[in-house]
Amino acid sequence: MTIFNSNGTSNGTYYQLTGSGKSTIILIHGLGLNHQMWQHQTPALAAYGQVLCYDLYGHGQSSPPPEKPGLSMFSRQLAELMDALNIKQATIMGFSLGGMIVRRFAMDYPDRAETIAILHSPHQRTQAAHDHIQNRVYQAQKDGPDATVEDALIRWFTDAF
């Protein structure tokens, strides 16, 4: 596995690039997670080309967001990372918030998203839901990603589960 830390790049994004070949698969994690969520999928996917996993701004080992976080900002982060790594086009897969970023990226840069996969990602949320997410982002920025775990467990594993 080849690991690169891109602190020297223009956008301060931490990433791992694994495998080789002409095709690239990019994996985007969800809110409060980091690139390591893909550690079990990366080896299998690397059989098909290079696999790029990275930490979103404010997550893992990446820099804090350069502006107020939003889908357009995260879309630009990915475009800048692809530019820095000379990746013209890729298959892009995102989980939860990562899926929302994939959709935004495909709208912003349609020629760069060869194929998209959206996993367990919400669509057309209400303003109240957006506000709740933004509060979780701020909580994770202030107190670290572990601060959102208890709330996530309550949401995901209800009594009915």
Sequence positions of predicted segments:
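Flexible "cap/lid" loop of the alpha/beta hydrolase fold
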Residues: 100-108, 112-143, 147-150
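Active-site glycine-rich loops that stabilize anionic/oxyanionic intermediates
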Residues: 21-22, 30-33, 96
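Active-site loop/oxyanion-hole signature of alpha/beta-hydrolase fold enzymes
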Residues: 39-44, 52-94
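Alpha/beta-hydrolase fold catalytic core
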Residues: 1-26, 46-50, 87-88
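Alpha/beta-hydrolase
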Residues: 159-161
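The serine-hydrolase catalytic nucleophile loop
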Residues: 30-42
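Alpha/beta-hydrolase active-site loop signature
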Residues: 32, 56-60, 123
